[in-house]
Amino acid sequence: MNITNIKTTYGYIGFIPFAFFSLLPWIIGGEPAKTLIIFQLGYGAIIITFLGGFSWGWSDEQINQKFNLSAGILFSLSGCLILLLTYFSKILIALIISIICFYFFYIFEKSSEVFKFKDDDYKKFRKILTLLVCISFLISSWYWINPYSNPYL
């Protein structure tokens, strides 16, 4: 099994909590649904913080490495912002920021010189995984704003 297959397998395993935390609220509803969405935001905040640190491992000879390091810190701080918004019950804002952060991290990673040398399977995997994570946050956002499922607006 080559390294791209291993990364792909682990990446999709890492997606399972996103799917679980976004779909289960539609099934069970009520207070547990709110808790599951909060868990999704917590998990997403951890992941985006972790992803932000990737830029520190990229080659220092890249043209924009100073920018990459700064952007990586901003993505990590956005994870803290998501947690803070969740703590203060600004769930919908945290969900929207999560979508934006994961999408922009993909754009950020795609623009790096490191990404250009990755094989096509990895590039396709990252695109699909980012899309799935963003969709999971959209599903949770729909649950949150649905007046029939959420009394917390």
Q: Where are the regions a protein language model picked out?
A:
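N-terminal membrane topogenic signal
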Residues: 1-14, 126
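Hydrophobic, membrane-facing alpha-helical anchors
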Residues: 23-26, 38-58
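Helix-adjacent hinge/juxtasegments
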Residues: 57-85
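Transmembrane helix-loop-helix
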Residues: 85-107
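Interfacial loop-to-transmembrane junctions
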Residues: 112-134
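Juxtamembrane boundary at the C-terminal end of a transmembrane helix
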Residues: 139-153
